[in-house]
Structure formats: C-alpha cells, structure tokens
Amino acid sequence: MAHKKGASSSRNGRDSAAQRLGVKRFGGQVVKAGEILVRQRGTHFHPGVNVGRGGDDTLFATAPGAVEFGTKRGRKYVNIVRVTRAEA
C-alpha cells in the first residue's frame, strides 16, 4: 500500500557519476610511456608487450610506441609496438 507521495516522489532524483571506463587510446595511435590505454573493471583486455596493469586493472604503456590490439587463445590483448622515426 502506498502511503502518500502518489505522483512524483521527492525521494527520487539521485544518480551516481559515470566511471569513465573504456578504451582511451585506439589501435595505431602513437603513445608515450605511462599513458593510459584502457580503463576497465576486471580484465576485459589483458596486458601484452610493453603494457602494464594497475591495481584497478587499468592498462598503461610502459614504453613509447604504437598501440596494437590482438587476440591470443581467446583473450584480447593490448600491445605497444616500437615505431621507428620514419613511421611516426
């Protein structure tokens, strides 16, 4: 049984701020060491070559280079491949 507040309740109207998760640097982009590549909850993407994983599962570049996404044994990986001056 409802007890008053039939139309629109003043008890509503709250929401949490978005977590801003997702891929921050896409395939082919050139990054510097320390740049965040993916913000995630859990390991949707796994760290590959020259990529580190933070305590909150954030993936970051450990060396400069180009971002490369790939799959290995059913897992998605993020790698950083070194680029020469001519390619960059």
Swiss-Prot record:
This is Large ribosomal subunit protein bL27. Belongs to the bacterial ribosomal protein bL27 family. The lineage of its organism: Bacteria, Bacillati, Actinomycetota, Actinomycetes, Mycobacteriales. Keywords: Ribonucleoprotein, Ribosomal protein. Pfam families: Ribosomal_L27. It comes from Mycolicibacterium vanbaalenii (strain DSM 7251 / JCM 13017 / BCRC 16820 / KCTC 9966 / NRRL B-24157 / PYR-1) (Mycobacterium vanbaalenii). GO terms for molecular function: structural constituent of ribosome. NCBIfam families: L27. HAMAP family: Ribosomal_bL27. GO terms for cellular component: cytosolic large ribosomal subunit. The gene is rpmA. GO terms for biological process: translation.
